[in-house]
Amino acid sequence: MTVTIATLGFPRIGPKRELKFALEAYWAGKTDADALLDTARDLRAKTWTRQAALGVAHVPSNDFSLYDHVLDTAVMVGAIPAAYGWSGGTVDLATYFAMARGDQGRPAAEACGPGCGHAPGADGVPALEMTKWFDTNYHYLAPELSPGQAFALTSSKPVDEFLEAKALGVHTRPVLLGPVTFLKLAKTKAEGFSPLSLLSALLPVYGQVLRGLAAAGADWVQIDEPCLALDLTDFERAELRRAYGALTHAAPGVRLMLTSYFGGYGENLATAVNLPVEGLHLDLVRAPDELEAALAASRESLVLSLGVIDGRNVWRADLPALLDRLEPVVARRGSDRVVLAPSCSLLHTPIDLDLETALDPEIRQWLAFAVQKVEALAVLAQALNGGRASVAAALEASAQAARARATSPRIHDPKVAERLAAVTPDMTRRRSPYDQRREAQRARLNLPPLPTTTIGSFPQTTEVRQARAAFAKGQISDATYEAFLRQETARAVAWQETVGLDVLVHGEFERNDMVQYFGEQLAGFAFTQSGWVQSYGSRCVRPPILFGDVSRPAPMTVDWWRYAQGLTRRPMKGMLTGPVTILNWSFVRDDLPRETACRQIALAIRDEVVDLEATGAAIIQIDEAALREGLPLRRGDWDAYLDWAVESFRLAASGVADATQIHTHMCYSEFNDIIAAIGAMDADVISIETARSKMELLDAFVGYAYPAQIGPGVYDIHSPRVPAVEEMTTLLAAARQRLAGEQLWVNPDCGLKTRKWPETQAAIVNMVEAARRARAS
């Protein structure tokens, strides 16, 4: 027997973002369902055959999704809220995409095309609530469940895709999101109701799926229960035992590989190793010390999947060092009971480093994307099966790359270290308490009650993207590109004045991404051409690679702010991305504590804040959209993270006078458990994403007696749906029941970059009218 390799999941989007473009063409009505599904089928085929060719013995299937795997699971088990008008049977694409993106409810004659995702003639309904997948930058759609929820098998996707791969000659290991994690991720509108109470109703459907896979020929099935990386109660652990007892009994011919990731099992390890499954995956990147405990606690027959290659970051592994750890494990456990794998699904990494033809060669040799990570696993397996000499050249190349990175002068900047050492506590505090700052800001800004604004970005149209691409390729000059951007900015400013917004933004047309734009102007970052990863649905991002010490060589946003402010007498916000978000939305160096890297970024942003104020900016927004997602999965680790995250924000924000108003923005967030940290950030105004939660997220601010101002999002920008004025006035009324009117701002949930202008204009006009009505009431 030999050591084999597995992947837990592979990127879905395609090396050239084929899925993104197929989805957007379908939604726009330019293509039909057959074209979309053909693209999806082609991507799956290439992914399966490529992994098999690289030597993966356990190739995953059912890890592909048209939008989100949690949504796929909800559809598979028939968890379709009544609002979507589903009457049983197969869930069609219109219903599927309505759950993902919302449903404007246009009459059939006005439907935007066969791929719009709207159910013509139905009442408009919002999308399911979207939130972050554990502590990653991927978003999932939260299932919406209710007491008495009925489940039924309504999709054959897992079996269909297993058979699809089988027809190509690839025997796969299907992947299912586990029933306990599925229920823990679900939302409910029923007070005091726990979705986990539905486990007994859900398990028979999972049993049907497993039996169907067994009948199709599957011998292993991977079941993901990442909830095992969380703090679980004794009851939840008991429910896991009950669930897996039932699943093992339901399909005795199928071997189950239980996977958890993004952290160790901790106090859940005893439960995990004793579940009636044949295999258990360990995330040995996040929890390297858990290997010995798992070996000692588990039965000899349990197959251990060792997640030794980082599935969430882009750094090349030191293979000889990994072999030093793995060789004793194989000798002790036996090669037939060891599988090598990434720490988690490779969904979170770019696909192929070979596509990066323009990347700095020195930095490139330090990196590994999904394909290269699989190749690294193959080298490890060959070394374990055939000896190190059989892959000597690959091992030496790996060791040489590790040495080169560790000794490169591009990693460390003594000036950055000196500046960081000179930071004092006073640099992380505003000059006066909030009450005093509020009066100074009121006098300076003279805004009406319930002031209206947007979060920052406006739609990046085809014309904007084409101009950016032409500029990047050298097809247009600097002057031509800047003139185009000025024209777009001027149009956006004029439109905002016309519709009556109180505080304006310049639209960010010059920015490709809210993190990449800043990273490109900061020392210590590198960027890719094709390093795309999925954020949600068709939304893809190219995270910067933070490889060295960070500093700001020159001002980054001042010129664009000065130009935009010169077009209007209304306040123009300076728009910055905060240090914690830049950190959390980047691939971060692993040779330095994250908090140290974050403080370096904070000093760079502080310089920009001070320069904006000196240029005349009265309002400066420092977005910390990703503050919460950086939270460790274990509560016991939260305080340490929040301490340095809040300190980093304050270090960036505290260099200004009392009359300068500091805004921040957070999205995808639940605030109850971090409200004290949000208060400690000491921002003058915070805008948050609340529309999908119907303002319930504000309850945290009420209980905390949050003193500063808040802009609760009054409509969901992740959906193309345009909310009615009455819908937004209802949300504002709900907000005013929770907070004093003088605390409230009126704004969308998030930036508008991914929306189209017609829906944006209609929604903002309605929002401004809703604010006017609310002021008059």
UniProtKB/Swiss-Prot annotation:
SUPFAM superfamilies xrefs: UROD/MetE-like (SSF51726)
One GO molecular-function entry: 5-methyltetrahydropteroyltriglutamate-homocysteine S-methyltransferase activity
Q: Where does 5-methyltetrahydropteroyltri-L-glutamate bind?
A: 17-20, 132, 539-540, 585, 629
Q: Which cofactor does the UniProt annotation name?
A: Zn(2+)
According to its UniProt record, the EC number is 2.1.1.14
How is the cofactor bound, as the UniProt entry phrases it? Answer: Binds 1 zinc ion per subunit.
In this protein, the active site sits at: 718
Q: What does this protein do?
A: Catalyzes the transfer of a methyl group from 5-methyltetrahydrofolate to homocysteine resulting in methionine formation.
NCBIfam families noted in UniProt:
met_syn_B12ind, PRK05222.1
Give the family, as the similarity comment puts it: Belongs to the vitamin-B12 independent methionine synthase family.
Q: State the protein's name.
A: 5-methyltetrahydropteroyltriglutamate--homocysteine methyltransferase
Organism of origin is Caulobacter vibrioides (strain ATCC 19089 / CIP 103742 / CB 15) (Caulobacter crescentus)
Lineage of origin? Bacteria, Pseudomonadati, Pseudomonadota, Alphaproteobacteria, Caulobacterales
Gene coding for it: metE
